[in-house]
């Protein structure tokens, strides 16, 4: 008997793809709630021909990477947000065309004083009830690409910003709480093979998470420690991860909201300026003492400061606001650039490779938490995670740099970062001629930071 999506809730009669070949979901329904579902965007040409999901080139890539990750395809439900193939495999163009038709229909109705006709339905909306009905028994889902991730989590965030970050979707009246691992689509991996190890890492992490084998433990956080407690903490470590949260993005004018310092397991957050722009977190005397402790720490030659973009943005803020230049510094952004120059270097991306941290950088509307945190508590918690994650990614990043024999490249890049920061500090755009001149000087000698 042919599979009928309407029996599972699909509104096929309203769908712009009505009459197209249906590619059914594949796999056994797992009523235990412990099974794994894989959700892509839509069938491709080969899938349409064979009426099976993920059997073309992207399907072969997926099968291989699932095996590497220890997940057996036959034990999963494999499906797509849409069960029918959009023309030229381009859902984006189809959605744009539907939106254009609806706008033109509204404009025509208004211009001719006619009733506004019912809008052309989105194929995603038409197939969504079917998808949710089929996924109801599954509490573990891997979403392949932005369309599937948005359908399962409601997130408007770029897939590149949240892939590899573990997400928990709350239960509703008719759906269970779900563990969701967003990652890129295997078709993207085929076009950009440098992402293959990232994709495999995401799948392997998902498997560990679903089996309860992940190793993520949030750090112990002390908020607004007094100066004595802070000084004692900072005196016990040869290197400390650091992060600043500010009220703006221009480092020469931004004011410091909070400073986070810590290790992989313990973080201290010193609040200075509330999001309301007025409230302080210490008495004037204690704030001065805490600030003095932090300034001594940032200039202590015997303690290395570790942070993401710390050698540029955070350095410029500290110079502008507190008159101190942090030294010595190891910038994890520069470290990762030296290890994998061809891939993104944001902390969320680096954390997704080297830790099992949950997604924390953006909310589900795609807003950066550092900018749009609802309150001071949320901002301080965000800062604490940044610090702990920076501390956790440092050892594997150093190993990656050494493995690729890129230590000299890192030293050069970090030296050039310092040159560019000096230019920015005096209000200059980066002078490329001078930058090149300084780069030639750096190539003639070796900088040692560790």
Residue map of PLM features:
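Conserved RNase H-like, two-metal-ion catalytic cores of nucleic-acid enzymes
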Residues: 46-47, 51-55, 62, 69, ...
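A polyanion-binding, active-site-adjacent surface
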Residues: 1-213
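Short strand-coil-strand connectors
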Residues: 170-176, 262-264, 426
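Mixed-charge, glycine-rich, non-catalytic linkers/tails in nucleic-acid processing enzymes
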Residues: 214-219, 326-335, 367-450
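A residue-level signal for conserved active-site and pocket-lining positions in enzyme catalytic cores
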Residues: 9, 141, 206, 243, ...
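Short beta-strand-alpha-helix junction that forms the catalytic/metal-binding core
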Residues: 35, 181-185, 268, 304, ...
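Metal-dependent phosphoesterase core characteristic of DEDDh/y 3'-5' exonuclease domains
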Residues: 62, 153-165, 177-190, 262-264, ...
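Active-site flanking residues adjacent to catalytic metal/cofactor-binding acidic residues
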Residues: 39, 79, 184, 242, ...
């Amino acid at each position: 008997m042919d599979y009928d999506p309407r029996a599972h809730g699909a509104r096929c009669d309203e769908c712009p793809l009505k009459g197209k070949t249906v590619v059914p979901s594949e796999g056994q329904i797992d009523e235990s709630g412990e099974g794994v579902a894989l959700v892509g965007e839509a069938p491709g040409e080969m899938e349409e021909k064979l009426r099976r999901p993920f059997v073309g080139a992207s399907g072969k890539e997926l099968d291989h990477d699932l095996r590497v990750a220890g997940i057996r395809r036959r034990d999963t439900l494999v499906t797509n947000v849409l069960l029918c193939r959009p023309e030229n495999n381009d859902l984006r163009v189809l959605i744009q065309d539907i939106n254009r038709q609806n706008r033109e229909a509204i404009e025509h109705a208004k211009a001719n004083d006619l009733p506004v006709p019912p809008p052309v339905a989105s194929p995603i909306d038409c197939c969504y009830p079917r998808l949710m009905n089929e996924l109801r028994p599954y509490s573990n889902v891997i979403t392949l690409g932005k369309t599937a991730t948005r359908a399962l989590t409601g997130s408007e965030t770029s897939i590149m910003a949240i892939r590899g970050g573990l997400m928990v979707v709350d239960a509703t009246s008719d759906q269970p709480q779900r563990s969701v691992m967003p990652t890129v689509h295997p078709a993207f991996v085929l076009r950009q093979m440098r992402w293959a190890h990232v994709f495999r890492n995401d799948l392997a992490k998902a498997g560990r998470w679903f089996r309860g084998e992940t190793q993520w433990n949030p750090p112990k956080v002390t908020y607004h420690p007094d100066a004595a407690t802070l000084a004692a903490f900072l005196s016990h470590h040869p290197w400390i991860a650091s992060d600043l949260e500010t009220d703006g993005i221009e480092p020469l004018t931004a004011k410091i909201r909070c400073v986070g310092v810590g290790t992989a397991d313990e973080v201290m957050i010193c609040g200075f300026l509330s999001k309301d722009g007025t409230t302080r977190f210490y008495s004037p005397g204690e704030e001065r003492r805490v600030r003095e402790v932090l300034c001594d720490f940032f200039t202590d030659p015997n303690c290395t400061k570790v942070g993401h973009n710390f050698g540029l943005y955070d350095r410029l803020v500290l110079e502008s606001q507190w008159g101190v230049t942090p030294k010595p510094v190891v910038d994890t952004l520069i470290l990762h650039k030296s290890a994998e120059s061809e891939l993104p270097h944001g902390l969320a991306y680096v954390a997704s490779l080297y830790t099992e941290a949950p997604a924390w950088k953006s909310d589900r509307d795609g807003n950066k938490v550092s900018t749009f945190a609802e309150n001071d508590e949320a901002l301080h918690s965000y800062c604490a995670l940044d610090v702990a994650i920076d501390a956790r990614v440092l050892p594997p990043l150093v190993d990656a740099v050494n493995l690729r024999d890129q230590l000299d490249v890192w030293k050069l890049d970090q030296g050039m970062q310092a040159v560019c920061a000096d230019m920015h500090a005096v209000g200059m755009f980066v002078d490329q001629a001078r930058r090149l001149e300084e780069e030639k000087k750096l190539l003639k000698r070796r900088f040692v930071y560790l």
